[in-house]
Every structure is written in C-alpha cells, then in structure tokens.
C-alpha cells in the first residue's frame, strides 16, 4: 500500500500543506535495504513536495509469523522514538494493518496533542483469526484490547466500503466517526493497452491464447489454490491459459500444485516491477480475484482497481455481500461466484473466451467506472479534505 500513502501525501502537499512521511527503508521483496539505504541509520530526504523520514527497523516481509511480528514491533518502537524529533503536526494519517503502526501513531498523537486518522485497509485481527493464523486466546484478547483502544483514540476512521464500515461499527465505534473512502488508482498510469506487448512476448504467450490473469498476493486469505482447481477443469482446452503472477505465503505452494498436476495451461510468475504493471494488466483477456469465504467485509483487494483501469472484465470468487462483489455488480463489468465454485469459474472463463465481444464490453464498462468513480483525481481530493477537516477539529461530513 506504499503507493497509496505516496499519492495521498503528494496530493496533500499539492494543496499547499507541509507533509512529512515517517517510514522505513525500501526493502520489498527481499527484506534488505536497497542501495543506498542503511538498515540502522535514519535519513531524511525530499521527494517531490514531501519530506520522507526513513527510520530503522527489522524488515521481514515474507518470513514466518514471529519474524513478521518482530518487523512490526521494531517499526512501532522506531516510530515512538524517532517520531518525537519531528515538529508537531496538525494531523497524523496512518494506514493499517499492521495494527502496530496504529499503536505507535496513537502514542505519537498523544505526545503532540494532535488528532490522528485511522485508514483501514484490512480489519485486523479479524482476518488473521478467520484464516487460522492467530489461534492463541491470550494473543487475541490482547489484540482486541489494543484494537478497541486505537478506535477510541482515533479522531476519525476511514473504511474502504459499506460492508467494511458496518464491521467496524459493530465493534462499538460511533457511526459519526467512520467515513467511506474507497481506494483509488491512477487511471493514467494504468490504461488499456494492446494485449500483444513486450512482456507477453518475453513470457512466450501466443497471440491466439485467451489469458485469465491473477495478479497480486498469494496469501492465506486469498485461496489461490482455487485457481489451480479451475485450471484443471480446463486442462484439455488449448485455447485458455491461466497466468498467475505475484508473491506471498502460498506462492511456492501454487508452483508445486501446478507441477504436481502437470497443468500445462497454467503459468506461474513472480511479480513484475511497478513500472511494468500496465503491460501485465494488458496481457489479460479476463482478470481474476479471489477471497476466502467470510473475508469479504474484512478486506478489499486493491488488484481489482488495476484490472478495471486496464479495461478488463473481472471474475471474482467472493462473498456475494462483500464490498468487492458490490463494486463489480455496480460497474456491470464481470461475474461474482461464491468462494470454492471452481466449476463455475471454469465455465465463465470458457464462456468469455467464446464471446470476445462481451469481454470487450465488460472491460469498457470497468474502465468507465474507474474514470467516473475511482480515479485518483476523483478520490484523493476527498481524502485530503477529510484530513483538513480533522486538523481543524471539525466533524467530517457523512
């Protein structure tokens, strides 16, 4: 989500505000500082109209749970220490998860006697409990208390969609305190392109192949093994290729599944640099999004906006009541199936492969919806106005 923070910071600075970002050193995906940064030396630099303060922490983006917790806790401690050296802000904005960032922000806001805005991307620890990665009742109780404290101390809370907002309200947060601010996308950076592009050529995907693309995180919450099951339904269909691109906890598992089942209609690739995202999105004839059952009001996969901005239809294996499902229905740009319906997914992919005019129509609708509702130029203005309102000590208009 670093690019969302960057774009919001730039938009805030463009309105004439002085903006400081407190963050770590660039380290994704290997967990080591990129040249010329150091893991232990804090540094400040000017990026456009924003001052970025990079502070030390123990990075571990893809390690076991205990390593990632060390990552989060070390950054929390670093924020508490180095954040106090900054000038007093009028308002602090923080993305969560990880919730440790919110704990550090709450402490910093108390130190400076200023308000902070909690921008929720995933509702945690709900997601971790749901997928089974968090089982200790003691740990859950501690995290619940911390969560309650953060919601109480935040001046305002931003949710990505109606269902996510409802889930937050059920935690006892006042309705006047929670507003909707969907994620956005730069529709100029990700725009429709020719499907026959250099990246497709590098990967050797023939022109006549219909490509079903999954691009994003292979996490426990996503249930990406469903895509392998759907591909197996179409293993004899030489027209369709499932292209799975990304990184995450289940990436190697997906590679092994593909190899063990001998699926020649599946290609698994590591994620491409952000500069090539538009090429990647353009390879698709249809794009895929998955979330495990019960996670629809906890998370809103940002990959969907990239799919839609690229002008591609979307098939989702999602809870029908989820914010993502509602987005696809409102845009009239795809199909929503229940999680686990791999037969239905195979059927819909085959149907779109046989009806390219319908695929193009849905893709055009997707692009139009992004331009009208979710383009950065549309959404960022609202986000900056909310921060300005909170900084003035006023109530955010619902």
Please describe what each predicted stretch is.
Residues 25, 163, 184:
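Carbohydrate-associated surface elements
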Residues 344, 351, 358-372, 379:
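A short, well-ordered alpha-helix in the C-terminal region of glycosyltransferases
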Residues 1-46, 236, 395-398:
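N-terminal subdomain of nucleotide-sugar transferases
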């Amino acid at each position: 989500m670093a690019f969302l923070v960057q774009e919001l910071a730039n938009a805030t600075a463009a309105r004439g505000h002085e903006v400081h970002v407190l963050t770590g050193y660039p380290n994704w995906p290997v967990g080591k500082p990129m040249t010329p940064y150091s893991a232990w030396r804090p540094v400040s630099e000017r990026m456009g109209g924003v001052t970025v303060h990079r502070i030390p922490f123990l990075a571990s983006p893809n390690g076991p749970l205990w390593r990632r917790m060390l990552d989060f806790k070390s950054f929390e401690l670093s924020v508490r220490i180095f954040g106090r050296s900054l000038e007093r802000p009028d308002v602090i904005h923080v993305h969560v998860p990880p919730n440790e960032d919110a704990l550090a922000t709450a402490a910093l806001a108390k130190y400076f006697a200023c308000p902070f805005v909690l921008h929720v991307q995933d509702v945690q620890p709900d997601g971790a409990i749901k997928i089974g990665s968090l089982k200790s009742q003691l740990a859950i109780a501690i995290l619940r208390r911390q969560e309650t404290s953060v919601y109480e101390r935040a001046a305002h809370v931003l949710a990505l969609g109606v269902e996510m907002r409802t889930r937050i309200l059920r935690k006892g947060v006042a309705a006047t305190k929670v507003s909707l601010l969907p994620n956005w996308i730069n529709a100029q950076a990700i725009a429709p392109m020719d499907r026959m592009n250099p990246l497709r050529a590098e990967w050797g995907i023939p022109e006549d192949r219909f490509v079903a693309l999954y691009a994003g995180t292979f996490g426990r919450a996503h249930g990406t093994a469903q895509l392998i099951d759907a591909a197996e339904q179409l293993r004899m269909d030489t027209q369709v290729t499932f292209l799975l691109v990304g990184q995450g906890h289940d990436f190697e598992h997906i590679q092994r599944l593909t190899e063990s089942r001998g699926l020649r209609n599946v290609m698994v690739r590591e994620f491409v640099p952000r500069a090539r995202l538009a090429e990647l999105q353009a390879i698709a004839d249809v794009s895929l999004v998955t979330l495990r059952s019960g996670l629809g009001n906890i998370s809103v996969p940002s990959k969907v906006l990239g799919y839609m901005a690229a002008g591609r239809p979307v098939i989702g294996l999602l809870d029908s009541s989820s914010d993502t499902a509602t987005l696809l229905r409102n845009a009239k740009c795809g199909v929503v199936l229940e999680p686990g319906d791999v037969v239905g997914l195979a059927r819909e992919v085959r149907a779109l492969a046989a009806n390219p005019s319908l695929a193009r129509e849905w893709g055009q609708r997707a692009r139009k919806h992004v331009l009208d509702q979710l383009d950065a130029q549309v959404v960022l203005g609202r986000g900056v106005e909310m921060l300005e309102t909170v900084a003035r000590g006023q109530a955010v208009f619902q």
